[in-house]
Protein backbone atom coordinates (compact mmCIF):
# COMPACT_ATOMS: atom_id res chain seq x y z
CA UNK A 1 0.00 0.00 0.00
CA UNK A 2 1.39 3.38 -1.03
CA UNK A 3 -1.09 5.47 0.92
CA UNK A 4 -4.31 5.20 2.89
CA UNK A 5 -7.49 4.21 1.06
CA UNK A 6 -9.60 6.51 3.26
CA UNK A 7 -10.12 9.01 0.42
CA UNK A 8 -11.25 6.24 -1.98
CA UNK A 9 -13.47 4.59 0.64
CA UNK A 10 -15.09 7.94 1.46
CA UNK A 11 -16.26 8.15 -2.17
CA UNK A 12 -18.20 4.90 -1.84
CA UNK A 13 -18.07 1.34 -3.18
CA UNK A 14 -15.19 0.63 -5.54
CA UNK A 15 -13.37 -1.84 -7.75
CA UNK A 16 -10.24 -1.43 -9.85
CA UNK A 17 -9.15 -2.28 -13.36
CA UNK A 18 -6.24 -4.71 -13.63
CA UNK A 19 -5.62 -3.39 -17.13
CA UNK A 20 -7.84 -1.15 -19.21
CA UNK A 21 -11.12 -2.96 -19.76
CA UNK A 22 -10.61 -5.75 -17.20
CA UNK A 23 -11.87 -5.30 -13.64
CA UNK A 24 -10.18 -7.35 -10.90
CA UNK A 25 -12.02 -7.60 -7.57
CA UNK A 26 -8.80 -9.01 -6.07
CA UNK A 27 -7.10 -5.61 -6.32
CA UNK A 28 -9.39 -4.30 -3.61
CA UNK A 29 -13.04 -3.57 -3.31
CA UNK A 30 -15.60 -1.92 -1.09
CA UNK A 31 -19.34 -2.42 -0.93
CA UNK A 32 -22.37 -1.27 0.97
CA UNK A 33 -24.80 -3.82 2.44
CA UNK A 34 -27.16 -5.55 0.01
CA UNK A 35 -25.73 -4.15 -3.22
CA UNK A 36 -27.48 -5.81 -6.14
CA UNK A 37 -24.33 -6.11 -8.25
CA UNK A 38 -22.47 -8.12 -5.61
CA UNK A 39 -25.54 -10.32 -5.14
CA UNK A 40 -25.28 -11.11 -8.86
CA UNK A 41 -21.59 -12.02 -8.50
CA UNK A 42 -22.29 -14.31 -5.53
CA UNK A 43 -25.26 -15.87 -7.35
CA UNK A 44 -23.08 -16.54 -10.39
CA UNK A 45 -20.52 -18.38 -8.27
CA UNK A 46 -23.17 -20.22 -6.23
CA UNK A 47 -24.49 -21.73 -9.47
CA UNK A 48 -21.13 -22.77 -10.91
CA UNK A 49 -19.42 -26.09 -10.80
CA UNK A 50 -15.65 -26.25 -10.78
CA UNK A 51 -13.80 -29.15 -12.33
CA UNK A 52 -10.08 -28.49 -12.26
CA UNK A 53 -9.47 -31.52 -14.48
CA UNK A 54 -11.15 -29.60 -17.32
CA UNK A 55 -9.22 -27.81 -20.02
CA UNK A 56 -7.68 -24.78 -18.30
CA UNK A 57 -8.59 -22.66 -21.32
CA UNK A 58 -12.24 -23.21 -20.41
CA UNK A 59 -11.72 -21.94 -16.88
CA UNK A 60 -12.86 -18.35 -16.60
CA UNK A 61 -11.30 -16.05 -14.00
CA UNK A 62 -13.13 -13.79 -11.59
CA UNK A 63 -11.71 -10.89 -13.63
CA UNK A 64 -13.67 -12.03 -16.69
CA UNK A 65 -16.86 -12.78 -14.74
CA UNK A 66 -16.88 -9.43 -12.93
CA UNK A 67 -16.02 -7.52 -16.12
CA UNK A 68 -18.80 -9.28 -18.05
CA UNK A 69 -21.37 -8.50 -15.35
CA UNK A 70 -20.25 -4.86 -15.26
CA UNK A 71 -20.55 -4.61 -19.06
CA UNK A 72 -24.16 -5.79 -18.71
CA UNK A 73 -24.64 -2.85 -16.31
CA UNK A 74 -23.11 -0.29 -18.69
CA UNK A 75 -19.37 -0.49 -18.01
CA UNK A 76 -17.36 0.76 -21.01
CA UNK A 77 -14.06 -1.18 -21.26
CA UNK A 78 -12.60 1.48 -23.59
CA UNK A 79 -13.30 4.46 -21.31
CA UNK A 80 -10.30 6.26 -19.81
CA UNK A 81 -11.13 7.44 -16.32
CA UNK A 82 -13.29 6.60 -13.34
CA UNK A 83 -16.69 5.11 -14.15
CA UNK A 84 -19.59 4.67 -11.77
CA UNK A 85 -21.49 1.50 -12.65
CA UNK A 86 -24.27 0.01 -10.50
CA UNK A 87 -23.27 2.42 -7.72
CA UNK A 88 -19.64 1.22 -7.80
CA UNK A 89 -16.71 3.48 -8.71
CA UNK A 90 -14.44 1.63 -11.15
CA UNK A 91 -10.89 3.02 -10.99
CA UNK A 92 -8.30 2.81 -13.80
CA UNK A 93 -5.20 0.58 -13.38
CA UNK A 94 -2.96 3.41 -12.14
CA UNK A 95 -4.91 3.47 -8.84
CA UNK A 96 -4.43 -0.13 -7.68
CA UNK A 97 -2.37 -1.89 -10.35
CA UNK A 98 0.52 0.27 -11.60
CA UNK A 99 2.69 -2.80 -12.33
CA UNK A 100 2.79 -4.04 -15.91
CA UNK A 101 2.17 -7.81 -15.76
CA UNK A 102 4.34 -8.46 -18.82
CA UNK A 103 7.37 -6.34 -17.91
CA UNK A 104 7.15 -6.01 -14.14
CA UNK A 105 7.71 -2.26 -14.50
CA UNK A 106 5.87 -0.19 -11.88
CA UNK A 107 4.68 3.25 -12.96
CA UNK A 108 3.58 5.29 -9.96
CA UNK A 109 1.36 8.35 -10.42
CA UNK A 110 -0.28 10.84 -8.08
CA UNK A 111 -3.33 8.52 -8.27
CA UNK A 112 -1.56 5.33 -7.10
CA UNK A 113 -2.84 3.89 -3.81
CA UNK A 114 -1.69 0.27 -3.92
CA UNK A 115 0.53 -2.06 -5.94
CA UNK A 116 -0.62 -5.55 -6.92
CA UNK A 117 2.53 -7.70 -7.13
CA UNK A 118 1.11 -10.71 -9.02
CA UNK A 119 2.17 -13.48 -6.62
CA UNK A 120 0.32 -15.99 -8.86
CA UNK A 121 -0.16 -18.33 -5.89
CA UNK A 122 -2.54 -20.51 -7.92
CA UNK A 123 0.25 -21.42 -10.34
CA UNK A 124 2.81 -24.16 -9.92
CA UNK A 125 6.39 -23.16 -9.08
CA UNK A 126 7.50 -23.91 -12.66
CA UNK A 127 4.67 -21.76 -14.08
CA UNK A 128 5.76 -18.87 -11.85
CA UNK A 129 9.37 -19.33 -12.99
CA UNK A 130 8.28 -19.34 -16.64
CA UNK A 131 6.31 -16.14 -16.11
CA UNK A 132 9.26 -14.50 -14.31
CA UNK A 133 11.52 -15.47 -17.22
CA UNK A 134 9.02 -13.90 -19.63
CA UNK A 135 8.94 -10.69 -17.56
CA UNK A 136 12.75 -10.42 -17.49
CA UNK A 137 13.12 -11.17 -21.19
CA UNK A 138 10.29 -8.81 -22.12
CA UNK A 139 11.87 -6.04 -20.07
CA UNK A 140 15.33 -6.66 -21.51
CA UNK A 141 14.49 -7.46 -25.15
CA UNK A 142 10.91 -6.27 -25.67
CA UNK A 143 8.28 -8.34 -27.43
CA UNK A 144 10.94 -10.51 -29.12
CA UNK A 145 12.23 -11.50 -25.69
CA UNK A 146 8.71 -12.35 -24.56
CA UNK A 147 8.21 -14.51 -27.66
CA UNK A 148 11.49 -16.31 -26.99
CA UNK A 149 10.42 -16.96 -23.39
CA UNK A 150 7.12 -18.33 -24.71
CA UNK A 151 8.98 -20.69 -27.04
CA UNK A 152 11.24 -21.85 -24.20
CA UNK A 153 8.19 -22.57 -22.02
CA UNK A 154 6.13 -24.17 -24.79
CA UNK A 155 7.17 -27.78 -24.06
CA UNK A 156 5.90 -27.40 -20.49
CA UNK A 157 2.54 -25.96 -21.60
CA UNK A 158 2.09 -28.70 -24.22
CA UNK A 159 2.94 -31.34 -21.60
CA UNK A 160 0.44 -29.83 -19.14
CA UNK A 161 -2.27 -29.63 -21.80
CA UNK A 162 -1.68 -33.26 -22.85
CA UNK A 163 -1.79 -34.37 -19.23
CA UNK A 164 -5.22 -32.77 -18.66
CA UNK A 165 -6.91 -33.08 -22.08
CA UNK A 166 -4.86 -35.50 -24.14
CA UNK A 167 -3.46 -34.91 -27.61
CA UNK A 168 -6.86 -33.81 -28.92
CA UNK A 169 -6.91 -30.96 -26.39
CA UNK A 170 -3.48 -29.80 -27.58
CA UNK A 171 -4.57 -29.78 -31.22
CA UNK A 172 -7.89 -28.05 -30.48
CA UNK A 173 -6.13 -25.36 -28.41
CA UNK A 174 -3.49 -24.81 -31.08
CA UNK A 175 -6.21 -24.52 -33.69
CA UNK A 176 -8.08 -21.94 -31.61
CA UNK A 177 -4.89 -19.91 -31.25
CA UNK A 178 -4.47 -20.12 -35.03
CA UNK A 179 -7.96 -18.63 -35.58
CA UNK A 180 -9.40 -21.98 -36.58
CA UNK A 181 -7.06 -22.40 -39.55
CA UNK A 182 -5.56 -25.75 -40.43
CA UNK A 183 -2.28 -26.33 -38.62
CA UNK A 184 0.48 -27.84 -40.71
CA UNK A 185 2.56 -30.35 -38.80
Language-model features, listed with the residues they occupy:
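Glycosyltransferase-associated regions of secretory-pathway enzymes
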Residues: 2-185
Amino acid sequence: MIRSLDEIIAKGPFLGEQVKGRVNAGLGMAAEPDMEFYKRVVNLYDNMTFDLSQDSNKQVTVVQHVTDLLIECGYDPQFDGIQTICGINIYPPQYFNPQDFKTGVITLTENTYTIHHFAESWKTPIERKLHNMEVVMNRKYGSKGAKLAYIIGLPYWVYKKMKTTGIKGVVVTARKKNNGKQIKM
